[in-house]
Every structure is written in structure tokens, then in C-alpha cells.
Amino acid sequence: MRVRILIAFAMLLTVPLPGLSRAQDASMGSGIKVNVTGFRNDKGQLGCSLWPGPQGFPRDDSHILKHIWAPIKNANGECVFGGIFPAGDYAVTLFHDENKNGKFDSNFIGYPLEGYGFSNNAKAQFAAPSFDECKFHYDGAGWKQISVKMIYR
């Protein structure tokens, strides 16, 4: 049991430090808001990652600009990436951490066991979509609002 707790804690440390913030960034005057719908239940939490470019997308967490955890209520969630971000193209990846273990669970062949989603509602066919399929433009001022629907397999 202690080993599992230590492993889970170690995995949480791999999330970039800015990601330790939660959804309270809404008090800031600008940023990116992601409305997420289609959860199959309200268990666990919503993990949201903001990517500033194609490098490492979507698997190398070291290239994530910001990661946050948000609650799920009535099959909906909202990720608020508040703060000053320069104008440019960004992408968002999300997952429904149903068991609240801080990671995206998959089976031994990589088949998703939890829900996930991408900005632009890009679909994963035999592989994850590319950054170009998921990117959206943020002009660097005010709030950019996007919507994503969760996918379950």
C-alpha cells in the first residue's frame, strides 16, 4: 500500500509546477476557458493541459505550458487557464481521471480506460490527433472560450 501511495505521489510530481493551481484562475482578467461536456459520471476529476506548440504534443508532458485539475458536476467541467499568454496557437488535451489517481489510465495495449478529449473536438482514430488538428488561435487579450466533448471508448 505504501509503495502505491509513493508511486502515485511521484507521478503527481511529474506534472509541471504551474499545474498545481486549480480552476480558481478565473479571477484573472484574461486567459483561456474550456467548457467540457459529456462526462459519463461525476466521479474523480478533470485533468486539463494547455500546449503552446507542437513540440511533444500530446505525449511529452515536459512541454505542457500549464496543467490544472477541475471538478466535475452534472456531467460538465470547466478548465480556466487564467493569466497572460502571448498571442499564438495553442491546443488543449483533457482526461476524466475517474479514479483520481492523477494519471490517464489505459490497458496493456494502450486502449483508454478513461474519457479524454482534444480542443476542436479532434478525433483520435488509430493514434492521437496532431497539434495542427487541435490548435486554436488566442489573440493574447481577454478570454478565449472553447468547448470540448469527452470521448469514451
Regions found by a protein language model. Give the residues of each.
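A short, amphipathic beta-strand motif
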Residues: 30-38, 48
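Sec/Tat signal peptide C-region and signal peptidase I cleavage site
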Residues: 17-25
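Short proline/glycine- and polar residue-rich coil/turn motifs
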Residues: 70-76, 137-140
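Bacterial N-terminal signal peptides
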Residues: 7-16
